[in-house]
């Protein structure tokens, strides 16, 4: 984890969980920027590398980092460390931000913040030592949510139908789901000493979350949703008509069709429809990532 010396001097010190409540109180003192203020500061930093402009951009978004970091508290790491890593991602986002592209800084920086936090969690869990694949990362950061959606809170093995559902949802193999679930149930590296569940009660972090609206949060979420929707529409054009139709009917419809129904439409087996669905989903994800990368919406990976 980076030390506080890598952060701008105006960022409050964050030494450990004991000071976390003080830190969250301190960052609420920084004013929220209006769109025109944010634009002018971003232009000043972009054109003149003005450190004061950069500091104001960073400090006005520290609450965003804290809120995102709170969402990762179920991985057994101190929230203070997650926030510190997120702050580093925020500063990278500020450095790369182009105000002329029409997005608010929060919409752009959220990619960098999440990437920085996730990479830190992965390093801490030593998944990289296993040769972390894109599928493993996807599973690691979505498995708890999907299990929660199907009320599968137990730490034991998943039921076969639960494995099938998660594998199909994420476009990975059943074996990868089973292996990742077992690894996460064991708590990763024993040195992490994980003591909290995602549905646990009485944790200090639970009452430290800022309940006030987060700097035009609704507007920012709408902007991000619009960006993702545009990327999805463009990425769908990379699929052929059959792939597009099957993927839409299986994953993007309010009333998804069954494999049997689609197998009758195309005169192929249910397994063939499933294969086309998985392949189309994989192509769609890659297309979205390529489009996002071309538009500089993603951090550059080392």
From Swiss-Prot:
- Motif: Interaction with polymerase core subunit RpoC; annotated at 81-84
User: Where is it localised?
Assistant: Cytoplasm
Q: Which residues bind DNA?
A: 259-278
GO terms for biological process, alphabetical: DNA-templated transcription initiation; response to heat
InterPro entries attached to this UniProt entry: RNA_pol_sigma-70_dom, RNA_pol_sigma70, RNA_pol_sigma70_r1_2, RNA_pol_sigma70_r2, RNA_pol_sigma70_r4, RNA_pol_sigma_r2, RNA_pol_sigma_r3/r4-like, RNA_pol_sigma_RpoH_proteobac
Chief location: cytoplasm
Q: What's a single GO MF annotation on this record?
A: DNA binding
User: What is this protein's name?
Assistant: RNA polymerase sigma factor RpoH
Annotated source species: Zymomonas mobilis subsp. mobilis (strain ATCC 31821 / ZM4 / CP4)
| Encoding gene per record | rpoH
């Amino acid at each position: 984890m980076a030390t506080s010396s890598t952060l701008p001097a105006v960022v409050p010190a964050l030494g450990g969980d004991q000071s976390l409540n003080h830190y969250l109180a301190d960052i609420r003192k920084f004013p929220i920027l209006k769109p025109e203020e944010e634009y002018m500061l971003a232009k000043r930093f972009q054109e003149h590398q003005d450190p004061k402009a950069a500091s104001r951009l960073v400090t006005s978004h520290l609450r965003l980092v804290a809120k995102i970091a709170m969402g990762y508290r179920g991985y057994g790491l101190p929230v203070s460390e997650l926030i510190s890593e997120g702050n580093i991602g925020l500063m990278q986002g500020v450095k790369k931000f182009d105000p002329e592209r029409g997005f608010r800084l929060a919409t752009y920086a959220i990619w960098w913040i999440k990437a920085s936090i996730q990479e830190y969690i992965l390093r801490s869990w030593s998944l990289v030592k296993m040769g972390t694949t894109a599928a493993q990362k996807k599973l690691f950061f979505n498995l708890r949510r999907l299990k929660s959606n199907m009320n599968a809170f137990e730490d034991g093995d998943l039921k076969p139908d639960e494995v099938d559902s998660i594998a199909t949802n994420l476009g990975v193999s059943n074996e990868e789901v089973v292996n990742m679930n077992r690894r996460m149930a064991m708590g990763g590296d024993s040195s992490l000493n994980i003591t909290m569940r995602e549905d646990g009660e009485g944790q200090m972090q639970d009452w430290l979350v800022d309940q006030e609206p987060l700097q035009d949060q609704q507007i920012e979420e709408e902007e991000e949703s619009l960006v993702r929707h545009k990327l999805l529409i463009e990425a769908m054009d990379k699929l052929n008509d059959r792939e597009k139709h099957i993927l839409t009917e299986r994953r993007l419809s309010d009333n998804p069709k069954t494999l049997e129904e689609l197998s009758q439409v195309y005169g192929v087996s249910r397994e063939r429809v499933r294969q086309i669905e998985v392949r189309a989903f994989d192509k769609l994800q890659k297309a979205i990532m390529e489009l996002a990368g071309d538009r500089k919406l993603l951090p550059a990976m080392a």
